[in-house]
Amino acid sequence: MSFALGQRWISDTESDLGLGTVVALDARTVTLMFAASEENRVYARSDAPVTRVIFNVGDVVDSQQGWSLQVEQVVEDQGVYTYLGTRVDTEESGVALREIFLSNQIRFNKPQDKLFAGQIDRMDNFVLRYRALTNQYQQHKSPMRGLCGMRAGLIPHQLYIAHEVGRRHAPRVLLADEVGLGKTIEAGMIIHQQVLTGRAERILIVVPETLQHQWLVEMMRRFNLHFSIFDEERCVEAFSEADNPFETQQYVLCSLDFLRKSRQRFEQALEAEWDLLVVDEAHHLEWHPEKPSREYQVIEALAEQTPGVLLLTATPEQLGRESHFARLRLLDADRFYDYEAFVKEEEQYAPVADAVTALFSGEKLSDEAKNKITELLSEQDVEPLFKALESHASEDEIALARQELIDNLMDRHGTGRVLFRNTRAAIKGFPVRNVHLLPLEIPSQYTTSMRVAGMLGGKLTPEARAMKMLYPEEIFQEFEGEESSWWQFDSRVNWLLEKVKAKRSEKILVIASRASTALQLEQALREREGIRATVFHEGMSIIERDKAAAYFAQEEGGAQVLICSEIGSEGRNFQFANQLVMFDLPFNPDLLEQRIGRLDRIGQKRDIDVYVPYLTETSQAILARWFQEGLNAFAETCPTGRAVYDAFAERLIPILAAGGGEELEVIIEESAKLNKTLKSQLEVGRDRLLEMHSNGGEKAQQIAEQIAKTDGDTNLVTFALSLFDAIGLHQEDRGENALVVTPAEHMMVPSYPGLPYEGATITFDRDTALSREDMHFISWEHPMVQGGIDLLMSEGVGTCAVSLLKNKALPVGTILLELVYVVDAQAPKRSGISRFLPVSPIRILMDARGNDLSSQVEFESFNRQLSPVNRHLASKLVSSVQHDVHRLITASETAVEPRVSAIREQAQRDMQQSLNSELERLLALKAVNPNIRDEEIEVLDQQIKELTGYIAQAQYQLDSLRLIVVAHN
């Protein structure tokens, strides 16, 4: 390397310093000043990591004064260059610009500039960049985008609802699946799709206070969506950042109580302009035409201001038609304006539902059913279908006609677009619950303390006394002190120890109401029998709970027993276990259902054993009998439980408080009767049409199968590992489909997106991720992959490379130039552009004569024949063929233009076809189904106009290039 004062060089390792100038030289070192970043660097002359900057005829260079020069001649004097040419702004010719006056800000961003400046990348980085572009393009185009990356089982009805709703603009729907069918996951999938496609950027989730953590965990674990819980303390903290604390975060989670209690916070939340509002447990919003509750008014105001609204409820409408109407009113007040009109309209659907049931079972349609269908659908549409059903056509034709009738009825179904409800009855695949009620003798220690407590408890309300009597171990501790070891004599603990020893190979989940009970049970198992158990309660942080859950999930060396408190277990699922022990009983049937729901969920592969050890002659025994004989709540899901409880609570509570009573038998008998009546009402009122629409039938199966195919994508594994390598992450194989990825010292960036500071355990396998909550499930949609690709692009990794092709059939020194162009439409993300015209790579392979060989020579097989070149040799090769490379770049533009036009045209066709058919369907439906909102049609119309413009304006640019030189050895 020969240096001279005033020469301009660029740093190979710190390209962001800008253009450097040689300011000092001695025998061993050279000093460069980088004026743009105000930095100096001293290098050893013999191997300084810098590259000489020399421009060529035809280049446009910037001066420090801000004007540009088109270079026509380059003159050298004692190692320093002067550029002669024409000024671009004044068109003055013969202007000289000495290199010392070149702009300090010159950056070599264009791939060809970097190539000529000697900033040549590794060959494998060029390959990685091209693969990143092609994979990203395929992901954006996939109709399943937003559904593949979540950590959840592929359950058809959930995927169908998410696919159906997630693609809508500002969806407003009511998700009313029964308990255990995964409404939270459906909502999460919808949110995930809306976020990925840019349709929703600001999201507010409002839930009951006890469910805040569950939602936080589910969104983070399953969808990599990081919400912030907002309470009064958080709002006060955020006040320093913004006047409105809700504007400091994009994704906010808060409790309904918090918004109800503070008018100021409620008004701030209203002003914060959300794109999507999600409300869980929406059945708690009470409404009467004259007097809506404060909670209802809070949500109503938010729903009016927010374009997208998802309401979640587990209560079927048959158990409260008025409150069902109130929920629909929140979604579309113009459509559901009057309760009486709504009831009338609902009544019209009853015969339709009957007709559909008949169609489904393949029975012959009655004349009444036919008339009803003809009233709803026009005669010319249905007549040929009726004929087909009654003719001697083939089974396939009859099935087709039947399906078409059902589809048409579904589209016309009043609430089909706003309401989704799946029931266990309509969805197969649930386990059987084997119930074991185990009456155990009450220890004398408890009898004494409970008798004394009964005498002292005069001031307590019956409800408080009833609650107290359910937990004799707590009463005993009140008298004997916190440290008293009740677990040494409690017969339930003795039974539990025997059961755990007898079921050594099984994982056992134990649920107790209180955190203190759970902790003491763990101590009992450990101290009395040395059994490995772990605890899960509300006093633990999310990370501690994750660790406990992972310890329980581990096949080898894990805990055999997990002991949960009531609140601690909310929202966690342990489908890999099928043994459930209820150490005590909760007061209300919903909580009981929630407990069993930890194991009895869709996706549970085995039947479940539910053990209920209870002490005789206590309130527990009464409650166990009422749950079992009055509600049958242990053996079956009990959607009616709450309604029956509300009807009998006043009579049942005093009996629980007293530990018995004459009226108990009557209450049990009457409860069973009411339960039966309510259940049959539910069955009669089952809306088959709605159920079919909600579970998606065949279509749902296809979606699940399509996603399952992408799950085993080895291409993703290879790509992700190369990506982590290129960025400098440390990887360690942990077996069991797991890898540990940690930040390393020499990373390209200080912190890697989506990767915690301490690193993470990752897996590419969905089943492993489902059983191990401490692992990240890596998919194309995961922030670590998406963020890594963004890093490659923004840091300019792999934009130029040089490779050797060892091929004796070609003369030595033959050159080929591989160029990757990208077509990109500058448009806001929320316009939906990425569905039709994502960043699209075009590969061109020019031979020395300027012919494009890309259609004959496929990228991967060609790449396997190439070998890398060290940087020094690469720079020499580039210098020797610089003129040819310039020529080939110009020639490649002629080759790329027709392909760009073809991409634009195809994108226009796809967009018009997809959105116009959607628009036509909505317009046709609007004529017969008042549930189609005008706003939805207007937005779609506007979207078509905007996208037409954006696609027409799409530009192309050179993203990366590789020079290939033929060698023989």
From Swiss-Prot:
Family note: Belongs to the SNF2/RAD54 helicase family. RapA subfamily.
Subunit and partners: Interacts with the RNAP. Has a higher affinity for the core RNAP than for the holoenzyme. Its ATPase activity is stimulated by binding to RNAP.
General function of this protein: Transcription regulator that activates transcription by stimulating RNA polymerase (RNAP) recycling in case of stress conditions such as supercoiled DNA or high salt concentrations. Probably acts by releasing the RNAP, when it is trapped or immobilized on tightly supercoiled DNA. Does not activate transcription on linear DNA. Probably not involved in DNA repair.
Gene this chain is encoded by: rapA
Xref: HAMAP family: Helicase_RapA
GO molecular function terms listed in the Swiss-Prot or TrEMBL record: ATP binding; DNA binding; helicase activity; hydrolase activity, acting on acid anhydrides
Protein name: RNA polymerase-associated protein RapA
Enzyme class, UniProt record, top EC level: hydrolase
Residue span of motif DEAH box: 280-283
Protein EC: 3.6.4.-
Species of provenance: Vibrio cholerae serotype O1 (strain ATCC 39315 / El Tor Inaba N16961)
Domain Helicase ATP-binding: 164-334
Residues annotated as domain Helicase C-terminal: 492-646
Pfam families attached to this UniProt entry: Helicase_C (PF00271), RapA_C (PF12137), SNF2-rel_dom (PF00176), Tudor_1_RapA (PF18339), Tudor_RapA (PF18337)
InterPro entries reported for this sequence: Helicase_ATP-bd, Helicase_C-like, Helicase_RapA, P-loop_NTPase, RapA_C, SNF2-like_sf, SNF2/RAD54-like_C, SNF2_N
Stored PROSITE patterns: HELICASE_ATP_BIND_1, HELICASE_CTER
